[in-house]
Amino acid sequence: MLTEEKEDYLKAILANDGDTSFVSNKKLSQYLNIKPPSVSEMVGRLEKAGYVETKHYKGVKLSDEGLKHTLDIIKRHRLLELFLIEVLQYNWEEVHQEAEILEHRISDLFVERLDKILDYPETCPHGGIIPRNQHFEEKFTVSLLEFEPGDKVTIKRVRDKTELLVYLSSKNISIGNDVEIVTKYETNKVMIVKRNDIVTILSYDNAMNIFAEHV
């Protein structure tokens, strides 16, 4: 049986495209904010259990069994997030941590009932696709960083990063909102966006975790 820690590693691998390509341990270390030796040790355990495969100098990739299990975790997590917002009236920046706790403690039957009562939703509150039939492909994949000054875009997806969600909420920016790309500063690695004449500064790191499409 997988521990919560191992499941979090599997989700991190998938978040870095580890279903179709190899992810370096260094990248995982940065993503999880965990020291490289600890990452290497955990990857070894996951490989021994059959959830990942590794290749020297390339990194780690989910096995078929690992992908199946990871998609199940993500489905649980995203359904829980939606339930917490729609039924229990949580804010979108609050649900990620709650779902992280609950996703490991609910049965398959509970997930089925949750899915049904929510009418089989396509996306979570942050715009992420809810996996179905072992299929997973995010619908919105173009980050804000890829747009140019003057572009007007609609926010479609934001990664589950609590600090980023809190910041966006403080600026009244959410899924479905239109913003204009004002300028980008390569030297400082920040960009400025505007919504309803309110200016918001985003680091490039944050902008890479916000996905949009042209209005």
Residue ranges of predicted features:
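Short acidic, hydrophobic short linear motifs in intrinsically disordered regions
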Residues: 19-27
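Key DNA-contact positions within bacterial/archaeal DNA-binding proteins
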Residues: 37, 93
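Short, hydrophobic-biased segments on the C-terminal half of alpha helices
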Residues: 43-44
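A short, conserved structural fragment
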Residues: 47-55
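Basic, amphipathic "hinge/linker" alpha-helix immediately C-terminal to the N-terminal HTH DNA-binding motif
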Residues: 58-77
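Mid-protein regulatory/catalytic core that forms ligand/cofactor-binding pockets
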Residues: 103-211
